[in-house]
Amino acid sequence: MFEHDHGVAVSAPVAPSAHDGALTARMLPVDGMLLLEPAARAGCGKDGRAACHALVHAGIAVTEHFMRYSQVSSYGRNVVHGLHCQLPPCAQGRLMHCSRGAIWAVGVDVRTGSRSFGQWAGQTLSAENGHQLWIPPGFLHGLCSLHEDTEVICRHTRPSAPSCERAIRWNDGILGVDWPVTDRQAVLFPSDGQAPSFSNVIDWFFCS
């Protein structure tokens, strides 16, 4: 069981899917990642409390601080942002969804000892489908914007801490993430273009 006592803890094994009424939490192939799918599209993507209830129903105990730490970002088409994480004691779990446009979002397990270490899972999140992606602490995260004028809302279990931030190259050959854009199409932030290889990840997080 992987635990983090600042904002979130996985308190029980997650069933393949769990339903709280408004959102269904579906387990993804990479251990710990969840896709929240609305039972009815209207309003679900914007309802943070419904998302919290769905996570708790799936066995993830989210504290009240989860609602406080949110970030809204806007992107043009083909912008790639990632792969990023925050190290302990500031490790973040995050819940992502699109309020406008669409993104392809990805999480990569970098927890030493995890059965899915080095594996990734990606999902398309859009304002239309209302899907939300839960990426636990101990994961790299990234996204690619699929439309112009895309707006993304991320809720974090911990606030941003620049001293704890780390990055890995988005198209690292070891990870082999299957991005929806080519190297030539991708629009990168300067810092992301200079990020190191996945081989630099040495015991950033532990999974017991």
What would you call each of these model-derived segments?
Residues F2-E128, H147-D149, H156-S208:
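Non-catalytic, conserved peripheral segments adjacent to functional cores
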